Amino acid sequence: MLPAPHRLRDRRAFQALYQGGQRRSGAGLTLLFQPMPAGCEGIPSQVGLVIGRKVSKSAVKRNRLRRQLREILRPLCPNLKPGYRLLFISKANLLTYRWPELRAEVHRLLQKADLLVSTDVDSTGADSDAKPS
Protein backbone atom coordinates (compact mmCIF):
# COMPACT_ATOMS: atom_id res chain seq x y z
CA MET A 1 0.00 0.00 0.00
CA LEU A 2 1.21 3.46 -0.80
CA PRO A 3 1.72 5.82 2.15
CA ALA A 4 -1.42 7.94 2.67
CA PRO A 5 0.12 11.30 1.65
CA HIS A 6 1.24 9.75 -1.66
CA ARG A 7 -2.19 8.42 -2.70
CA LEU A 8 -4.09 10.22 -5.43
CA ARG A 9 -7.79 9.79 -4.70
CA ASP A 10 -9.57 12.97 -5.77
CA ARG A 11 -11.78 12.50 -8.84
CA ARG A 12 -11.13 16.07 -10.00
CA ALA A 13 -7.38 15.47 -9.86
CA PHE A 14 -7.79 12.40 -12.09
CA GLN A 15 -9.86 14.42 -14.57
CA ALA A 16 -7.33 17.27 -14.56
CA LEU A 17 -4.55 14.81 -15.32
CA TYR A 18 -6.50 13.30 -18.22
CA GLN A 19 -7.25 16.73 -19.66
CA GLY A 20 -4.03 18.63 -19.12
CA GLY A 21 -1.32 16.29 -17.90
CA GLN A 22 1.97 15.73 -19.65
CA ARG A 23 2.32 12.23 -21.08
CA ARG A 24 5.20 9.77 -21.19
CA SER A 25 4.53 6.37 -22.74
CA GLY A 26 6.22 3.03 -22.46
CA ALA A 27 5.39 -0.35 -23.94
CA GLY A 28 3.04 -1.37 -21.12
CA LEU A 29 2.27 1.81 -19.19
CA THR A 30 1.48 5.45 -19.81
CA LEU A 31 2.41 8.06 -17.22
CA LEU A 32 0.39 11.27 -16.95
CA PHE A 33 1.79 13.93 -14.65
CA GLN A 34 1.41 17.59 -13.82
CA PRO A 35 2.46 19.95 -11.03
CA MET A 36 -0.03 20.45 -8.22
CA PRO A 37 -1.96 23.74 -8.17
CA ALA A 38 -0.34 26.86 -6.73
CA GLY A 39 -0.12 26.86 -2.97
CA CYS A 40 0.66 23.14 -2.79
CA GLU A 41 4.44 23.45 -2.99
CA GLY A 42 6.31 21.03 -0.78
CA ILE A 43 3.44 18.56 -0.60
CA PRO A 44 4.58 15.00 -1.42
CA SER A 45 3.80 13.81 -4.93
CA GLN A 46 0.60 11.81 -5.25
CA VAL A 47 0.29 8.66 -7.35
CA GLY A 48 -2.80 7.08 -8.90
CA LEU A 49 -3.23 3.83 -10.83
CA VAL A 50 -5.70 2.97 -13.58
CA ILE A 51 -5.94 -0.68 -14.60
CA GLY A 52 -8.71 -0.96 -17.17
CA ARG A 53 -10.71 -3.90 -18.43
CA LYS A 54 -8.62 -3.94 -21.59
CA VAL A 55 -5.89 -5.54 -19.50
CA SER A 56 -8.19 -8.33 -18.30
CA LYS A 57 -11.88 -8.81 -17.69
CA SER A 58 -10.95 -10.68 -14.52
CA ALA A 59 -10.97 -8.37 -11.50
CA VAL A 60 -8.63 -10.80 -9.74
CA LYS A 61 -5.94 -10.28 -12.39
CA ARG A 62 -6.43 -6.51 -12.48
CA ASN A 63 -6.22 -6.27 -8.68
CA ARG A 64 -3.07 -8.40 -8.65
CA LEU A 65 -1.45 -6.06 -11.16
CA ARG A 66 -2.58 -3.05 -9.10
CA ARG A 67 -0.98 -4.57 -5.98
CA GLN A 68 2.26 -5.23 -7.87
CA LEU A 69 2.44 -1.65 -9.15
CA ARG A 70 1.77 -0.26 -5.68
CA GLU A 71 4.55 -2.43 -4.27
CA ILE A 72 6.96 -1.19 -6.95
CA LEU A 73 6.02 2.44 -6.28
CA ARG A 74 6.05 2.26 -2.47
CA PRO A 75 9.86 2.40 -2.03
CA LEU A 76 10.10 5.05 -4.77
CA CYS A 77 7.67 7.49 -3.11
CA PRO A 78 10.29 9.21 -0.91
CA ASN A 79 12.45 9.75 -4.02
CA LEU A 80 9.75 11.44 -6.11
CA LYS A 81 10.03 15.17 -6.67
CA PRO A 82 7.48 16.87 -4.39
CA GLY A 83 4.50 18.77 -5.73
CA TYR A 84 3.41 16.53 -8.61
CA ARG A 85 0.39 14.39 -9.38
CA LEU A 86 1.13 11.17 -11.26
CA LEU A 87 -1.21 8.72 -12.93
CA PHE A 88 -0.06 5.36 -14.29
CA ILE A 89 -2.42 3.97 -16.93
CA SER A 90 -2.08 0.35 -18.00
CA LYS A 91 -2.04 -0.88 -21.57
CA ALA A 92 -3.53 -4.17 -22.73
CA ASN A 93 -0.20 -6.05 -22.81
CA LEU A 94 0.79 -5.21 -19.23
CA LEU A 95 -0.50 -8.52 -17.89
CA THR A 96 2.26 -10.36 -19.77
CA TYR A 97 5.02 -8.46 -17.92
CA ARG A 98 7.04 -10.28 -15.29
CA TRP A 99 8.06 -8.56 -12.05
CA PRO A 100 11.51 -7.29 -13.21
CA GLU A 101 10.07 -5.99 -16.50
CA LEU A 102 7.24 -4.21 -14.70
CA ARG A 103 9.65 -2.64 -12.21
CA ALA A 104 11.97 -1.51 -15.03
CA GLU A 105 9.05 0.00 -16.97
CA VAL A 106 7.91 2.09 -13.97
CA HIS A 107 11.44 3.27 -13.24
CA ARG A 108 12.07 4.10 -16.91
CA LEU A 109 8.91 6.22 -17.13
CA LEU A 110 9.76 8.13 -13.95
CA GLN A 111 13.25 8.84 -15.26
CA LYS A 112 11.87 9.86 -18.66
CA ALA A 113 9.55 12.35 -16.95
CA ASP A 114 12.42 13.54 -14.71
CA LEU A 115 10.35 12.96 -11.56
CA LEU A 116 12.96 11.18 -9.45
CA VAL A 117 15.03 13.29 -7.07
CA SER A 118 18.09 11.12 -7.72
CA THR A 119 18.45 8.59 -10.53
CA ASP A 120 20.99 6.43 -8.69
CA VAL A 121 18.25 5.19 -6.34
CA ASP A 122 17.82 1.43 -6.28
CA SER A 123 14.17 1.01 -7.20
CA THR A 124 14.34 -2.74 -6.78
CA GLY A 125 13.95 -2.92 -3.02
CA ALA A 126 15.97 -5.29 -0.85
CA ASP A 127 16.24 -8.27 -3.21
CA SER A 128 16.58 -7.35 -6.87
CA ASP A 129 15.06 -10.53 -8.33
CA ALA A 130 12.58 -11.42 -5.61
CA LYS A 131 8.90 -11.11 -6.35
CA PRO A 132 6.63 -10.23 -3.42
CA SER A 133 4.13 -12.87 -2.47
UniProtKB/Swiss-Prot annotation:
<dbReference type="GO" id="GO:0030677">
    <property type="term" value="C:ribonuclease P complex"/>
</dbReference>
<dbReference type="InterPro" id="IPR000100">
    <property type="entry name" value="RNase_P"/>
</dbReference>
<dbReference type="Pfam" id="PF00825">
    <property type="entry name" value="Ribonuclease_P"/>
</dbReference>
<dbReference type="GO" id="GO:0042781">
    <property type="term" value="F:3'-tRNA processing endoribonuclease activity"/>
</dbReference>
<dbReference type="InterPro" id="IPR020539">
    <property type="entry name" value="RNase_P_CS"/>
</dbReference>
<keyword id="KW-0255">Endonuclease</keyword>
<keyword id="KW-0378">Hydrolase</keyword>
<keyword id="KW-0819">tRNA processing</keyword>
<comment type="subunit">
    <text>Consists of a catalytic RNA component (M1 or rnpB) and a protein subunit.</text>
</comment>
<keyword id="KW-0694">RNA-binding</keyword>
<comment type="similarity">
    <text>Belongs to the RnpA family.</text>
</comment>
<dbReference type="GO" id="GO:0004526">
    <property type="term" value="F:ribonuclease P activity"/>
</dbReference>
<dbReference type="InterPro" id="IPR020568">
    <property type="entry name" value="Ribosomal_Su5_D2-typ_SF"/>
</dbReference>
<comment type="function">
    <text>RNaseP catalyzes the removal of the 5'-leader sequence from pre-tRNA to produce the mature 5'-terminus. It can also cleave other RNA substrates such as 4.5S RNA. The protein component plays an auxiliary but essential role in vivo by binding to the 5'-leader sequence and broadening the substrate specificity of the ribozyme.</text>
</comment>
<dbReference type="GO" id="GO:0000049">
    <property type="term" value="F:tRNA binding"/>
</dbReference>
<dbReference type="GO" id="GO:0001682">
    <property type="term" value="P:tRNA 5'-leader removal"/>
</dbReference>
<dbReference type="InterPro" id="IPR014721">
    <property type="entry name" value="Ribsml_uS5_D2-typ_fold_subgr"/>
</dbReference>
<keyword id="KW-0540">Nuclease</keyword>
<protein>
    <recommendedName>
        <fullName>Ribonuclease P protein component</fullName>
        <ecNumber>3.1.26.5</ecNumber>
    </recommendedName>
</protein>
